Structure formats: C-alpha cells, structure tokens
Amino acid sequence: MAKQDYYEILGVERGADEKAIKKAYKRLAMKYHPDRTKGDKTSEEKFKEINEAYEILSDKEKRAAYDQYGHAAFEQGGFGGAGAGGFGGGFGGFGGFEDIFSEMFGGGSSRQRVVRGDDLRYDIEITLEEAVRGITKDIQIQTLATCDHCNGSGAEKGSKVETCPTCHGHGRVRRQQGFFMTETTCPHCHGTGKKIEKPCKKCHGDGRVHKTESLSVKIPAGVDTGNQLRLAGKGAAGENGAPAGDLYVVIHVKEHHIFERDGNNLYCEVPISFTQAALGGEIEVPTLDGRAKLKIPEGTQTGTMFRMRGKGITAMRSGYSGDLICKITVETPVKLTDEQKDLLHKLEASLEGKTTQRPKSSSFLDGVKKFFDNLGK
C-alpha cells in the first residue's frame, strides 16, 4: 500500500515553515501519545506515522530530498541509508524531538517539580430564609495543609534535600522505545523530584499533613441550590511550595413548609373559606418580609392565582426582585350542624337555574348534555 504524504499526515501545506510544522506535530503527538491512548493499536500506528513525518520535515536536508524524490529518497540505499522505513532505530536521528517532548511533558529541566494543590468541595445546606437574606456560616473541612514542622520541605531540620539523580528533579522519567517516548513517575523519588536525607517525622517527607481547617463562608443573598462559591487558595496545599487549590462551596437550599421556589419567584397555597370565596374580602398572606394584605374578589374559584409583585427573591447579581404567586384553595366546610346544612340547602335551591351565578357548573352540564346527545345519534 502506498505511503501517505508526510505533509498530509501532519495536516500542513507543502510550503509550511518550521514553526507551523512543529506546532502541528506537537498537537498531533499530544493527541496520539501512547500514554493518552492506552494501548489503542490504531493510535499507536498513527503516532508512528506522525513521528516519521516530523523526522523528515523538521530536517532541512531530508525535507529537500523528500520534496524532490518523495518516499523513494528514504528507501533502501536512499537518504542516510536508514533502511526501508527510513529510520535507523530509536530516537537517535530525530532532531528536535527531545526538545518538543520536553515542552509537552515538562522534561529536561532540573527544577524541582511543583504541583498545585487539589481543589476541594464542600456541600452546605441552608434554609430558604438564609438563602434570601444571605448569611455567614462557619464550616470545617478535611484538607492537606503545609507541614508546620518542616515548613513544607519534607525534611527534618538540618537534613539535606537534593535533586533526585534519576529524574533530575522532574519527578517523571522518559523512556525511548523505537518510535515511542513514554513518561512515567520516577521510581526513585516517587514523583517528588527530590532526595531527602532524613524525612520529616511529622509528614514523612511529603511536606503536607492532613488537617481539619475551620473557615467562615460568607453566603450572599439570593443564592439557590446548585450555586457554587469559590474560595481561592482554600483548597489542599500544593507540593514543593506550589499554590494551594481552591475550595468550592456548593449550596443546597432546604425545602420550605410554606413556599416553593422557582428561580426568583415564590409560590404558596392560600386556603380561604367558602364564604370568603363567594363574598370576597381581604385576607392576610405570608411573605418573606412578614404579613401582607391580599384582596380576594367575589366569586374567586379554587386554583385562581394572584401575583404580588416584588415579594419574591432578589436576584444575586442583577438586584431584580421576583414575585410571590398565591394559589387559592377554597375549603369545603365539614362537620356541619343541621342548621348549617339547612341553610346550604336553601342556598342551593335559590341558585337552581341561575347560570350566571354558577358559570362553571352550567358550562359543565351543558357539555355533558351535548356529549350524551352525540352518543345517541
């Protein structure tokens, strides 16, 4: 099968400069690197092709030969006598590969490896009233803190801390296997990048210790379930003096016994008596600011909703206030006396045939009549 064009493999134009070729190689090598693809044979073959293409196109002489003769320039007896594959083995002839993988994976430097601390999560439950008004809560978190005995060095006082001779402070080691370059945690220093003569007794050389931290968290007014508050630098301590991670406080608002929340609006069910619904009047309803008056028109039915503007929740960022929506439930009287029953019977009799006074009932009965009339046809 004919070999694919090297320029096509890297996805660059034939006139691409060295910078564009290097950039394309870095992107593809990172994508198909064996450490990322975990044994995927197709990706391994792709990685070989990418390395082969870059080995040729990154070298001016080899690229010139390829541009003139194509793949034939590197066949048996061709350019450099590298054999049918065009390579002599290993990465020995790959100019620039060492530098690129150093950039991609942080190798080649004798600097001690620094790793930012982990981000932490804390779930907190608050009441609706606390969510509406805002509150400061004291919390305790389990975290990794800088060891106060060795100040994070991991070494006992007076003990030497040297750069790991195996990984030269990188914390990881690279191995070349044909076209592949793999990187693993240094087996000598276990990724710390350093060699400690006498490890700290308290943290055992890690430089960090498990600790319970107490914090005050200011929760702003208007938060809702699922909102996250980020406390920068309040996560786990970093390794070797690296910055600490962040703490994310996740809000959970408890269900309320009166109100239901939908965004910045509040909903509540308001029961009224049979006579209040029929005659109308003014009732008291609960709001987050206390009691408020609500006017009930004559003839109010169950399910009617009244909107009280601005009586909802004030948004955290915009300052816009939602509404309170009151849903009316008309209560049917129970355990009536004989006298009360007699009065209701008289009322029922007086309403007989008065369609304007019982609009829903009349409409329903008309609909039922039409339904049965149609069945009989």
UniProtKB/Swiss-Prot annotation:
In this chain, Zn(2+) 2 is annotated as bound at 164, 167, 186, 189
GO CC term (a single one): cytoplasm
Query: Where found in the cell?
Result: Cytoplasm
The cofactor binding remark recorded in the entry reads: Binds 2 Zn(2+) ions per monomer.
Q: Which UniProt keywords apply?
A: Chaperone, Cytoplasm, DNA replication, Metal-binding, Repeat, Stress response, Zinc, Zinc-finger
Domain J as annotated: residue spans: 5-70
Which residues hold Zn(2+) 1?
Answer: 147, 150, 200, 203
Instruction: List GO BP terms, alphabetically.
Output: chaperone cofactor-dependent protein refolding; DNA replication; protein refolding; response to heat
Q: Where are the CXXCXGXG motif repeats?
A: 147-154, 164-171, 186-193, 200-207
Q: Give GO MF terms, alphabetically.
A: ATP binding; heat shock protein binding; unfolded protein binding; zinc ion binding
Q: Which cofactor does it need?
A: Zn(2+)
Which ranges form a coiled coil?
A: none
Where do the zinc-finger regions (CR-type) map?
Answer: 134-212
Q: Which Pfam families match?
A: DnaJ, DnaJ_C, DnaJ_CXXCXGXG
Keyword Metal-binding recorded: yes
- Entry function: Participates actively in the response to hyperosmotic and heat shock by preventing the aggregation of stress-denatured proteins and by disaggregating proteins, also in an autonomous, DnaK-independent fashion. Unfolded proteins bind initially to DnaJ; upon interaction with the DnaJ-bound protein, DnaK hydrolyzes its bound ATP, resulting in the formation of a stable complex. GrpE releases ADP from DnaK; ATP binding to DnaK triggers the release of the substrate protein, thus completing the reaction cycle.
Q: How does it assemble?
A: Homodimer.
**Record text about domains:** The J domain is necessary and sufficient to stimulate DnaK ATPase activity. Zinc center 1 plays an important role in the autonomous, DnaK-independent chaperone activity of DnaJ. Zinc center 2 is essential for interaction with DnaK and for DnaJ activity.
Family from the record: Belongs to the DnaJ family.
Q: What is this protein identified as?
A: Chaperone protein DnaJ
- State the organism of origin: Actinobacillus succinogenes (strain ATCC 55618 / DSM 22257 / CCUG 43843 / 130Z)
